[in-house]
């Protein structure tokens, strides 16, 4: 209720919004994924969780990767009232600049000491320190943390799968069909 009051006062969102959190995971020169988690008035809606593997040509840019993920999510799901970006004002402004839709966008950035609870919420109307606004911190930090957890989980899964496939395909006499049979046999 307090978070909804904040949204009403500061972002003119008058109903229980569908908030989608985005996070980018991956290292430079490696696979990169964008995760998307959806929250409604009942909490997380895992049926709308998605992650997207970022194409290699834009994977070196977190900002372009983020825009790629947001656009892909909006195209496939589309049911969004508020975008929450794990990043700062730069991330928020870059996403807004590259979207051709009228969807509210906010961002959560870590504080100077990167301690939990010292984050800042960025909106088009200004920035708010979480330590001074207990009413907004729980909801937005929960969404940010869930997006981060989901991003890391999927990044690690993809990375492990890529390593396994790469290793098996390097074995003499083992091709894609044998690899598929091995995965099917061991259900992994």
Please report, for each region that a protein language model flagged, where it lies by residue.
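Acidic, glycine-enriched active-site microenvironments
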Residues: 1-188
């Amino acid at each position: 209720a307090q978070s909804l009051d904040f949204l009403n006062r500061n972002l003119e969102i008058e109903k229980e919004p569908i908030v989608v959190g985005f996070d980018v995971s991956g290292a430079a020169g490696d696979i990169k994924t964008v995760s998307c988690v959806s929250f409604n008035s009942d909490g997380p809606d895992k049926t709308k969780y998605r992650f997207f593997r970022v194409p290699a040509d834009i994977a070196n840019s977190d900002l372009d990767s983020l825009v790629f993920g947001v656009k892909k999510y909006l195209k496939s799901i589309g049911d969004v009232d508020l975008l929450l970006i794990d990043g700062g004002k730069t991330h928020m402004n870059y996403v807004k600049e590259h979207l051709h839709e009228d969807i509210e966008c906010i961002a959560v950035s870590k504080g100077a000491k990167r301690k939990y609870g010292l984050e800042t919420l960025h909106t088009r109307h200004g920035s708010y320190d979480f330590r001074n606004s207990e009413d907004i911190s729980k909801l937005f930090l929960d969404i940010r943390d869930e997006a981060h957890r989901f991003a890391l989980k999927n990044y690690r899964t993809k990375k492990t799968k890529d390593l396994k496939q790469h290793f098996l395909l390097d074995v003499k006499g083992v091709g894609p069909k044998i690899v598929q049979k091995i995965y099917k046999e061991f259900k992994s």
